[in-house]
């Protein structure tokens, strides 16, 4: 055997190992576990601007304020609409449980009716306040509810990403989230989801999510502009732009803020 015949297979193996290292050093599940474990602070406050754009490019702008706080392994979130007048002081409260044995709790307060509506699990795939986000999108996905597979590597805005397929682990999960499948783009240096495509169960629609702007705030990488659009047959049906400002982490937040009573009281 010649020297070249011994070296060539070794060189090819080394090239394959080096080029494949980012994709094969971790499994899809391990990557998503790191995404889930990424630091997002013990609590957070922010102002939000939600822009709703219909298929005729008509725009509606809504202003909101949001509070979030970890309670052990669970998370609680409270959101109030501040404008326009027709949704002013509408509130949304979520308890995210870090257990597949218990459904997340969600309540929507409608001040015009002076009524609080509890969101049933069967309704969580419905649109949240006319946006491209569903009620299920407003909660945190549990890793145990999905089956993951690495599809390939690519780049988003010149940064290496993994493309990971996420399939619901059961028909119950599929119905709850309203997605047959998702492809998630995870930035390799941050273990942060920066883009996603969702195959909507009803109506043959696709939903595209893009973290347009990412900033480091208080040491935490944060998506400060999120663009979501719903399409069918390659035509955009609706689009939602969500912009964050005045984001603050690890502030003093009263845990009594996250109650139905406080939801009904308003900001």
How should each PLM-predicted stretch be described?
Residues 266-267:
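Short, solvent-exposed mixed-charge patches
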Residues 9-20:
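Bacterial N-terminal signal peptides
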Residues 26-112:
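N-terminal mature ectodomain segment of secretory-pathway/periplasmic proteins
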Residues 33, 50-51, 58-67, 71-73, ...:
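Ribonuclease/tRNase effector modules and their secretory precursors
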Residues 21-25:
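Sec/Tat signal peptide C-region and signal peptidase I cleavage site
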Residues 147-155, 167:
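Active-site cradle of extracellular carbohydrate-active enzymes
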Residues 82, 93, 105-109, 117-119, ...:
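Gly/Pro-enriched, hydrophobic low-complexity segments
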Residues 1-11:
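Bacterial N-terminal signal peptides that target proteins for export
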